[in-house]
C-alpha cells in the first residue's frame, strides 16, 4: 500500500503543497456563527459512483449537511476507474479487483488527487464511506472477496491521517451529531 515515502513521492507527482493548517479535531474552534466545512464521500450524498453503479446515500447525513459547505469526493473516480467497475479490495499491499487486476495505481492516484482537493477546500472534517479500500476507516474488507472485515484503513484515509486531517465514517459522524444534540 502507501508508505510515507510513497506518499511523499505521490505528493510530488500531483504537485500537492504541504499542509499548513492545524486540523486536529480537538483544535477546531466552535464560535457562534461559525459554520463547519465538510468533505464527504460522493456516494454518501447520493452520487452513483460505487463500483456497482449505485450509491450509499445517507438521508440523515444529507439533511444535516444542507446548511453547510460541502466538497464531494470520490477518489476511485478521480483515479480514472469507471462506474460501474469490478469490486476491489485491499490484498496485502495491493488493491485487487474481482477480475484479478491490480488497480493499486488508480487507487493511489485517486487518493492523491482527492487529498489535493480536500486540502485546497480546507474542511474541518472529512466524512467517508466505511469499509472501502479508499475511504474505509478502522475496518475494511480483507481482500479475499468473502465479505470478511479486518482492522485497517483505506488508502485515502491513510493519507488524510498522515496529514493530521480529521476523518470520521458516516456512522461515527451521525452518532456524534446525535450525542451532541441530546447533550444540550
Q: Where are the regions a protein language model picked out?
A:
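Mid-chain, well-packed structural core segment of small domains
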Residues: 101-138
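Short, well-ordered beta-to-alpha junction loops that form the rim of enzyme active sites
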Residues: 43, 129-132, 172
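Extreme N-terminal starter segment of soluble prokaryotic enzymes
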Residues: 34-38
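Short, positively charged and aromatic/hydrophobic N-terminal segments
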Residues: 7-9, 23-32
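Short, surface-exposed acidic-centric catalytic microdomains
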Residues: 56-97
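Short N-terminal binding/cap micro-motifs at the start of the first secondary-structure element
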Residues: 46-53
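Divalent-metal-activated hydrolytic enzyme cores
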Residues: 2, 24, 33, 78, ...
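Short, active-site-adjacent cap segments at secondary-structure transitions
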Residues: 80-81, 133-136, 175
Amino acid at each position: 500500500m502507501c508508505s510515507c515515502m510513497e506518499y511523499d513521492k505521490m505528493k510530488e507527482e500531483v504537485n500537492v503543497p504541504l499542509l499548513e493548517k492545524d486540523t486536529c479535531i480537538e483544535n477546531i474552534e466552535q464560535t457562534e456563527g461559525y459554520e463547519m466545512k465538510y468533505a464527504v464521500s460522493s456516494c454518501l450524498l447520493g452520487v452513483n459512483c460505487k463500483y456497482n453503479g449505485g450509491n450509499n446515500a445517507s438521508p440523515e447525513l444529507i439533511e444535516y449537511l444542507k446548511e453547510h459547505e460541502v466538497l464531494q469526493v470520490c477518489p476511485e473516480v478521480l483515479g480514472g476507474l469507471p462506474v460501474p467497475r469490478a469490486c476491489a479490495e485491499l490484498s496485502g499491499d495491493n488493491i485487487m479487483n474481482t477480475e484479478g487486476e491490480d488497480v493499486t495505481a488508480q487507487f493511489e492516484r485517486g487518493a492523491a488527487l482527492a487529498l489535493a482537493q480536500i486540502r485546497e477546500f480546507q474542511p474541518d472534517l472529512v466524512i467517508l464511506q466505511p469499509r472501502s479500500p479508499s475511504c474505509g476507516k478502522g475496518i475494511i474488507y480483507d481482500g479475499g472477496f468473502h465479505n470478511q472485515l479486518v482492522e485497517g484503513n483505506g488508502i485515502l484515509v491513510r493519507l488524510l491521517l498522515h496529514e493530521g486531517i480529521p476523518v470520521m465514517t458516516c456512522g461515527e459522524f451521525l452518532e456524534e451529531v446525535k450525542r451532541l444534540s441530546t447533550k444540550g
